């Protein structure tokens, strides 16, 4: 009988741990929003920038439009004709690429990178992310409203 009590306590502990870990992203997002609402301060890293190089302007426009339609990004800038040098298969190569600058919530970065990798024509697409440390509160709020976590 005494061994049943500790065992059930352990099961309850494990269930609580699993539920807490499963809900962590939601709880963190909620905590950040509450903190920001009460203090009026931005929480560093809640939003991110992604840099994505594309081989053509049409590819960049297609990727940009698709991620916007899926509401994975709030805004995409397309910078035409960036000169690029890189190592590929033991050689230094020169190319002209189109740079996408994407703004989103950090909670969507992994999903966005997975999606871009799946539709990008490169074998190894260049996708680099940076957390946004600060910025216009109104703009950052707009980013959060423009994208969806679902």
Swiss-Prot record:
Keywords, alphabetical: Signal
A Pfam family recorded for this sequence: CutA1
BP terms from Gene Ontology: response to metal ion
Superkingdom: Eukaryota
Signal peptide positions (record): 1-31
Molecular function GO labels: copper ion binding
Coiled-coil regions, chain positions: none
Subunit composition and interactions: Homotrimer.
Record-stated family: Belongs to the CutA family.
Full protein name: Protein CutA homolog
Natural source organism: Danio rerio (Zebrafish)
UniProt gene name: cuta
């Amino acid at each position: 009988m005494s061994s049943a009590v500790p065992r059930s306590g352990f099961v309850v502990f494990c269930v609580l741990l699993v539920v807490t870990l499963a809900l962590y992203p939601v709880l963190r997002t909620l905590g950040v929003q509450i903190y920001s609402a009460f203090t009026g301060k931005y929480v560093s890293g809640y939003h991110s920038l992604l840099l994505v190089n594309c081989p053509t302007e049409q590819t960049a426009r297609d990727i940009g439009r698709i991620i916007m339609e899926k509401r994975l990004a709030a805004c995409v800038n397309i910078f035409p004709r960036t000169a690029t040098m890189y190592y590929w298969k033991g050689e230094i190569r020169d190319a002209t690429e189109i740079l996408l600058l994407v703004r989103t919530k950090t909670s969507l970065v992994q999903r966005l990178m997975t999606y871009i990798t799946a539709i990008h024509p490169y074998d190894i697409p260049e996708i680099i992310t940076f957390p946004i440390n600060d910025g216009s509160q109104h703009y950052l709020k707009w980013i959060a409203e423009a994208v969806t976590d679902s």
